[in-house]
Swiss-Prot record:
Coiled coil: 84-122
Protein localization: Cytoplasm
Encoding gene per record: CDC37L1
GO terms, biological process: protein folding; protein stabilization
Keywords assigned: Chaperone, Coiled coil, Cytoplasm, Phosphoprotein
Region listing for Disordered, in residue ranges: 1-40
Species of origin: Homo sapiens (Human)
Protein name (record): Hsp90 co-chaperone Cdc37-like 1
Region (Required for interaction with STIP1): 278-337
Domain of life: Eukaryota
Subunit structure: Self-associates. Forms complexes with Hsp70 and Hsp90. Interacts with CDC37, FKBP4, PPID and STIP1.
Length: 337
């Protein structure tokens, strides 16, 4: 059955009895117990598997969503031309139609590539050595170790300091609440927040907390979109997150559809990966306490590679410069209350 929108989670609306029971014993702000080490290199295998899963997340997102957002912009431009008389109207209309046609072709090409990647993932799902295969470019591994260590320390320190606020943001369900919370805490608009939420999704699914995973996945994709929008527009993320919420609340055609599609795709990939053998050692051998899911203690067992972080949060909204330039009243500096 198709999931309702917004996705199920700890909403203010009445919840099913099963959902309430599932989340009733969940501490939103748990302590941070250390995750026990796996024997025989199991932790390293688990971490490497998480890295590959996040690499695939970037590949899927960049291939599908980028085309959809570009297509939405081209269609908006095409529609606006019909409302304005101009000597070159026919010429501009032809150019816009050509752009739409080209983007549709690119979208179809990416869709075929995405289907091929899904099939390959399913074929390798239960392979015991799947996580050690060279599925993607390994250039991210051969980075300067000193820089990696510094970035790891910075990322870990941020998540330790603001863990409760990140988790609070993850539990918000309304657009207005999320925007208001980020306005009050603009420092949370960063890659570390997106990374934390993504990892939290994997562990919630491993603990069979599907409804809560869907809620956190929604907020993880929100942060991914905001970060990529800022990156492509070359502005501070804290200065453009209102533009994202503006489009989300208005449910602008094309843009909102791309967000919903990516959210569903991300949740599907989380479920698929949690079934793979690369995820089993942590969930079966360690018996991770359910109160520690998503905590810093658990995250410390996962890879903190800066390129892994980049791969996790690099979703595609690839040509939003034109959109931002249209918003004359949108500040290109830190967003304030």
């Amino acid at each position: 059955m198709e999931q309702p929108w917004p996705p199920p989670g700890p909403w203010s609306l009445p919840r099913a009895e099963g959902e309430a029971e599932e989340e009733s014993d969940f501490d939103v702000f748990p302590s941070s117990p250390r995750c026990p080490q796996l024997p025989g290199g199991g932790a390293q295998m688990y971490s490497h598997g998480i890295e590959l899963a996040c690499q695939k997340q970037k590949e899927f997102v960049k291939s599908s969503v980028a085309c959809k957002w570009n297509l939405a912009e081209a269609q908006q431009k095409l529609g606006s031309l019909a409302l304005h008389n101009s000597e070159s109207l026919d010429q501009e209309h032809a150019k816009a139609q050509t752009a739409v046609s080209e983007l549709r072709q690119r979208e179809e090409e990416w869709r075929q590539k995405e289907e091929a990647l899904v099939q390959r993932e399913k074929m390798c799902l239960w392979s015991t050595d799947a996580i050690s295969k060279d599925v993607f470019n390994k250039s991210f591994i051969n980075q300067d170790k000193r820089k990696d260590t510094e970035d790891e320390d910075k990322s870990e320190s941020f998540m330790q300091k603001y863990e409760q606020k990140i988790r609070h943001f993850g539990m918000l369900s309304r657009w207005d609440d999320s925007q208001r919370f980020l306005s009050d805490h603009p420092y949370l608009v960063c890659e570390e927040t997106a990374k934390y939420l993504i990892l939290w999704c994997f562990h919630l699914e491993a603990e069979k907390k599907g409804a809560l995973m869907e809620q956190i996945a929604h907020q993880a994709v929100v942060m991914q979109f905001i970060m990529e929008m800022a990156k492509n527009c070359n502005v501070d993320p804290r200065g453009c997150f209102r533009l994202f919420f503006q489009k989300a609340k208005a449910e602008e055609e094309g843009y909102f559809e791309a967000f919903k599609n990516e959210l569903e795709a991300f949740k599907s990939r989380v479920r698929l990966y949690s079934q793979s053998q690369s995820f089993q050692p942590m969930t079966v051998q360690n018996h991770v306490p359910h109160s520690g899911v998503g905590s810093i203690g658990l995250l410390e067992s996962l890879p903190q590679n800066p390129d892994y972080l980049q791969y996790s949060i690099s979703t595609a909204l690839c040509s939003l410069n034109s959109v931002v330039h249209k918003e004359d009243d949108e500040p290109k500096m830190m967003d304030t209350v």
